[in-house]
């Protein structure tokens, strides 16, 4: 594009919160984990357009994050930040924080504060429990969240990795504690959306059509609460049993789920 703004690739990775520093960006590039427009990048100094499609692939063996789940959210941010999702400076809620993979990713991407909520107790990694930017809310049922539960301050970014419950049951509570204009980036787990009787062997949803139905079900419930869909992408890593999972980016007043975007997310995601 004539006149399009350009920047060094390493600097652009940092600007998009896909790398913590230019040195970290160089490590990602050297590991072959960065693609620009679908092509693997090899040089930090490569000039790229600031609108370019840049993706950092997850590395399941990378010990960087406190849990494997961090790579899942990192993949979602790689898809959504170029489309306008902002993490930096925001007060966030991590619903179903567990050991804190999502919380870890949010802090590295510049979140101001993270409220880490989980029904369990003592699971959050010590490095996060002892971080002044993290408020730990253990033994807390996400369905029962109120502003009082999270110290009276609404959040403007919600991320969620919840198991054994359809997302439609927790969406009202997440909306209740969100500020106007908040972004919700939630993992859709088809195995908890389609009903036990429709699961394949090992509890895995193998049908692409069923997985699409799961995403559509969550999007429809979100629409009832006034939330539209700004993005949908497959998680770069499957769930523990091999279930393919998806992220929905929701915001009040956003558009309806685009069927073409959903088809693309399913086609490009893990099989």
Annotate each PLM feature.
Residues 1-52, 91:
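A basic, amphipathic helix-loop patch mediating RNA/tRNA/ribosome contacts
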Residues 86-98:
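Conserved class I S-adenosyl-L-methionine
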Residues 100-101, 122:
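Glycine-rich SAM-binding Motif I of class I
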Residues 105-113:
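Conserved S-adenosyl-L-methionine
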Residues 115-165, 169:
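S-adenosyl-L-methionine
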Residues 168-185:
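A short glycine-rich, Lys/Arg-flanked "PGG" loop and its adjoining helix->strand segment in the class I
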Residues 190-207:
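Short, glycine-/aromatic-enriched active-site segment of Class I SAM-dependent methyltransferases
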Residues 244, 249-271:
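Flexible, glycine-/basic-rich loop-and-beta segments that form/coincide
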């Amino acid at each position: 594009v004539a006149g399009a703004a350009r920047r060094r690739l390493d600097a652009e990775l940092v600007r998009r919160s896909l790398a913590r520093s230019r040195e970290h960006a160089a490590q990602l590039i050297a590991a072959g984990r960065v693609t620009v427009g679908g092509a693997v990048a090899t040089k930090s100094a490569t000039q790229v357009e600031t609108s370019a499609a840049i993706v950092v692939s997850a590395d399941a063996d990378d010990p960087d994050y406190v849990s494997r789940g961090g790579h899942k959210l990192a993949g979602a941010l790689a898809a959504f930040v170029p489309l306008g999702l902002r993490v930096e400076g925001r007060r966030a809620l991590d619903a179903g924080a567990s050991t804190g993979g999502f919380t870890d990713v949010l802090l590295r991407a510049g979140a101001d504060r993270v409220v880490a909520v989980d029904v369990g107790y003592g699971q959050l990694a010590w490095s996060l429990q002892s971080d002044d930017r993290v408020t730990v809310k253990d033994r807390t049922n996400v369905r029962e969240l109120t502003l009082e539960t999270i110290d009276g301050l609404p959040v403007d970014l919600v991320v969620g990795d919840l198991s054994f419950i359809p997302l439609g049951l927790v969406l009202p509570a997440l909306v209740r504690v969100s500020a106007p204009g908040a972004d919700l980036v939630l993992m859709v787990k088809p195995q908890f959306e389609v009903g036990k009787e429709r699961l394949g062997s090992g509890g895995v949803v193998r049908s692409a059509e069923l997985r699409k139905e799961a995403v559509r079900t969550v999007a429809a419930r979100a629409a009832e609460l006034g939330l539209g869909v700004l993005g949908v992408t497959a998680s770069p890593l499957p769930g523990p049993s091999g279930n393919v999972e998806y992220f929905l980016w929701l915001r009040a007043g956003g558009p309806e789920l685009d069927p073409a975007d959903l088809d693309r997310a399913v086609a490009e995601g893990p099989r």
